UniProtKB/Swiss-Prot annotation:
Annotated function: Protease subunit of a proteasome-like degradation complex believed to be a general protein degrading machinery.
Regulation: Allosterically activated by HslU binding.
Name of the featured protein: ATP-dependent protease subunit HslV
Enzyme superclass (EC): hydrolase
Subcellular location: Cytoplasm
Catalysed reactions, as listed in the record: ATP-dependent cleavage of peptide bonds with broad specificity
UniProt subunit comment: A double ring-shaped homohexamer of HslV is capped on each side by a ring-shaped HslU homohexamer. The assembly of the HslU/HslV complex is dependent on binding of ATP.
Source organism phylogeny: Bacteria, Pseudomonadati, Pseudomonadota, Alphaproteobacteria, Hyphomicrobiales
Pfam families: Proteasome
EC number of the protein: 3.4.25.2
Any one GO molecular function term: threonine-type endopeptidase activity
Major place of residence: cytoplasm
Keyword annotations from UniProtKB, A to Z: Allosteric enzyme, Cytoplasm, Hydrolase, Metal-binding, Protease, Sodium, Threonine protease
Length: 186
């Protein structure tokens, strides 16, 4: 169990999946929030729109930390409009150098119509080699399922829905209450 200090268990665990295919990018996330071995909420919203709907993102990790990072990313997107990669690089610089921010425990997947990125507290800003990326405790299950489905006839949203269902059947920290956001890609 992840902990923020020696006494308090951290709210953690989720699955976030991003698929870019056929002119669309889709991010889906489950709704479960766990505290230790207990489910405390089943319908959390871990996927949302940013920058007046031009960017979608999802987070895994400590909820309050992720909301702080979403707010900071929103500010960077206002500072660098239409430049998702630049905004993310500037956010991760702050994340790594600011005393308060560097203690935040979260990962994010974000996308606009042109680029998909993973942001981590280690200072990573990574673009996937393929159109599929996942984070969280069920991320590897969702990623494997999505990769198996991506060459078939399913569209991006259907791949996200089926892959997240598979992850929820395997990962005890992931449920089937999905939030899905979609953007038309370039």
């Amino acid at each position: 169990m992840a902990q923020t200090d020696d006494r308090l268990p951290q709210m953690h665990a989720t699955t976030i999946l991003m698929v870019r295919k056929g002119g669309r990018v889709v991010i889906g996330g489950d709704g479960q929030v766990s505290l230790g071995q207990t489910i405390v909420k089943g319908n959390a919203r871990k996927v949302r729109r940013l920058a007046k709907g031009t960017v979608i993102g999802g987070f895994a990790g400590a909820t309050a930390d992720a909301f702080t990072l979403f707010e900071r990313l929103e500010a960077k997107l206002e500072q660098y409009p239409g430049q998702l990669t630049r905004a993310c690089v500037e956010l991760t610089k702050d994340w790594r150098t600011d005393r308060y921010l560097r203690r935040l425990e979260a990962m994010m997947l974000v996308a606009d119509k042109e680029v998909s990125l993973l942001l981590s507290g280690a200072g990573d800003v990574l673009e996937p080699e393929t159109g599929v990326m996942a984070i969280g405790s069920g991320g590897n299950y969702a990623l494997s399922a999505a990769r198996a489905l991506e060459d078939g006839e399913l569209d991006a949203e259907a791949i996200v829905r089926r892959s997240m269902k598979i992850a929820a059947e395997i990962c005890v920290y992931t449920n089937g209450n999905l939030v899905i956001e979609t953007l038309d890609a370039a």
